[in-house]
Amino acid sequence: MEEIQRYLQLKRSQQHDFLYPLIFQEYIYAFAHDRDFGRSILSENLGSKSKSSLLVVKRLISRMYQQNRFILSLNDSNQNPFWTCNNNFDSQIISEGFALIGEIPFSLRFKSCLEEKNKVNSQSLRSIHSIFPFLEDNFSHLNYILDILITHPVHVEILVQNLRYWLKDASSLHLLRFLLNDYWNSLITPKKASSSFSKKNQRLFLFLYNSHVCEYEYFFVFIRKQSSHLLSTSYGVFLERIYCYEKVERLXNVFIKVKDLQANLWLVKEPCMHYVRYQRKFILASKGTSVLMNKWKCYLVTFWQWHFSLWFHPRRIYINQLSNHSLEFLGYLSSVRMNPSVVRSQILENSFLINNGIKKLETLVPIFLLITSLAKAKFCNVLGHPISKPVWADLSDSNIIDRFGRISRNLSHYYSGSSKKKSLYRVKYILRLSCARTLARKHKSTVRAFLKRLGSELLEEFLMSEEDILSLTFPKPSSTLRGVYRSRIWYLDIIWINDLANYKSKI
C-alpha cells in the first residue's frame, strides 16, 4: 500500500487556481504560441471556418462583458441572453478557447515528465505499429486477455468531475458546465449527439474525452513497471489526482469484504500483467489462470463503478483465451497459434521423433470487414465485386489513378505486418478493377479495352509492393530481401491511421 501511495503523491502545483485567471489575462496568447509546447498540440488550425486564437477568445469575452451577456434576466429565466447573437460562432470560439487553455498545464506536465525520465526521443513511442512488435515479444508467453471497452460518459457532470481531480477552480468548472449543458441533448444520444458536438466543438470534445479515457487508465499505474516497454504518453500527464488517498482506502475496504488484504495485494502486484490501450479499447493480458482474470474483472468493475458513480456492465469486459479466440485490435485479427515442430533425435542406433509446439502471434487482415468498408465507400458491392466510382468520373485520369493508388498503397503499408497477405492481394485487386471501371465509365469504353490500351501504367501504380520499396533502401536485390518480403514488415513511421484501424468506418 505504501508503494501505491508513493505513486499517487500529489503535486502542490495542481492545487492552484490557474485556469480561471489565465482565461481573462492579457498574456494568455503568449502561452499558446510558445514553441516549447509544440505547435501541433496548442496552435493547430482546425479549418478555415473554425480557426481560434486566444486573442480572439480574449476579445470575445471582453465584448460579452461589455454587453452584459453573462447576466441572466430574473424576470425571464427561460431565456439565455448569452447566446442571443452569433450563437454557434460564440459557443464554438469559447469552447475551443477553453480546451486550448486546458491543454497548457497538461503539456507542461507531460514535458516535465519526459525530462524527469530522460526520455529525449519521445517520437519512438508514438508509432502505432510499435505495439505489434511488443505483442509478438510478450503475448506468445501469455494465456488470457481482458478485452475492455470504455464506456461513454452518461452525464456531463462526469466530464466535469474528471477535471475536478486536477483543477480546483470553481469558475472555470461552471463555465465548462455551461458549455456542456448547451449540448446535453446531443451528448445523451450516441450517434446524432456525438457527431453534432464533435463537429462544432472538436477541440473541446477531444480534450474532455481524452481526460475521461485517462480516468479509466490511471488505475494501471499499479502495473506501470510491467508495461514499461510501451508507456502511454498520457501516463505522466494524467496520473496524479486529488483525493486519491480516499479512493485507495475505499478500494481496500471494498475488497476486504470479499477477500483478505493479502489476497488483495497479491492481485495488484501480479508480476506478469501487460497493458495496451488504443482509442476505446484496453487490453490486459496475463499468463495466469482464468480464476485470476475473473478476479481482475471483478476488481475493475467494482473500482470503476464506485469511481464514476455509474453502472459498469460486466459484459464490457471479455475474458478470452489467446489460443482459442482472435483479438480485434488496431484493424487486425490477432491470435496466438501453436506451430508444430518435429525434431528427429538419434542416439546410437535408436532414433526418436520429438514433437515441439512453438507459440506464435498471428496477425491477419480482416478481409470481410475490409470488404464491408470498401462497399460502404462504393468501391465494390457487398459480395466484393468491384464497381465504378461515379463521383470521381469527372476528375482527370491521372487524378483518378492517383486516388485509387494512394488508397491501395496506404492499405498495403498498414497491413504489411500481416502473417498472410492473400487477403491483402484481394483488396488490391478490388481497388485496381474499380479504378479501371471508373476510367472506362468516364471514357465510355469497356474495361477490357481500356486495360488493353492503358496496360502497364495502371498495373505499376497498384503493384508496387514492399519488395520494390525495400529495393530502394537496399542497393542489390537478394534472396535475403525476398525472405524479408515474405515475412512481416512493421512500418514504424505510422503515427495516425484514421479509418484504417476502424475498419467499420468508411475508408
UniProtKB/Swiss-Prot annotation:
It is found in: Plastid, Chloroplast. It comes from Craterostigma plantagineum. InterPro entries: Domain_X, Maturase_MatK, Maturase_MatK_N. Usually encoded in the trnK tRNA gene intron. Probably assists in splicing its own and other chloroplast group II introns. HAMAP family: MatK (MF_01390). One of its GO terms (biological process) is mRNA processing. GO terms for molecular function: RNA binding. This is Maturase K. It holds the Pfam family MatK_N. One of its GO terms (cellular component) is chloroplast. The keyword Cell inner membrane does not apply. Belongs to the intron maturase 2 family. MatK subfamily. It comes from the Eukaryota. Keywords: Chloroplast, mRNA processing, Plastid, RNA-binding, tRNA processing.
